[in-house]
Amino acid sequence: MSVVDIPELTYEGRVLDMDQVGLLRRSDDALHDRDELHRRMGEDGYLYLPGLLNRDQVIDARGELCDRLHRAGMLDYSRPVMECVAAPQAQIDAAAIGPFMPELARDNASLHSVIYDGPMIDFYTFFLGGSVRHFDYTWFRAKQPGTTTATTPHHDFVYMGRGTPDLYTSWTPFSDVPFAMGGLMMLEKSHTHEDIVQGCGQTDVDLYCTNRGNAQEVVAAAQTSGRELTGEERQQIDWNSTGAYSSDAIATREELGGRWLLDEYRMGDVLVFSMHIMHAS
């Protein structure tokens, strides 16, 4: 596929400048060359690895995810469950759900076998040259369609940076994602903007104002119950930051330069990226 094959894309209903959109560089040709993988990670800020995972395993995990979404009332009951067609927006309380659904990953053996075992861990063991550890928490997005549900530009260090900085995100689609569905896009060379990396890139989104309202009580109650905050609870808290660099991917590209890079993704693909590359959807 060439850049000319990418259809006109939009962000929140507005057309992207297609002269500033490109394809991700594939790195499946360098899977067994550690030095080259590190060179590309340094140069690009990401490693796009189509077909790294066992597609049948990913499809099996998708089945469990679809069942959970169906039971949660998130799917259109008139369609086959495995199609994973979202329910009408009026039926879904997006504010209560929030941007992530960690319950989809909790105690999910088929999902964990994909993201925390097998080819995924084999890749990281080779890439990093030793044993690796994953987070206990899984950032699982269940994206709804529409012009108001786009993921805003951000980098991941603000969510994960309290411990070691030696971290990588493994974006793993559990659906085939044609361009029309709006898959992940990376802002070219954005990880090289040191002013941003050392500035807003050091924000900690888990900090909140402790002397306003009942924030401490809300957080303590969730911790005591061993659960995540609900979307409604999160709205009661005055957070240090939302984590977003901006609310506008088009304006962010115009400010920082570079192209938005993406591809059509298939189940089995993985996009590995560093903590400081800007991305959105």
Could you say what each language-model-derived stretch is?
Residues Y48-G51, R133-D136, T169, G183-M186, ...:
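A structural signal for short, well-ordered beta-strand segments and their strand-loop junctions
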Residues G51-L53, F174-P178, K189-H191:
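Short loop segments at secondary-structure junctions
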Residues F127-L128, M160-F179, N240, E264-M267, ...:
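Short, conserved beta-strand element in jelly-roll/cupin
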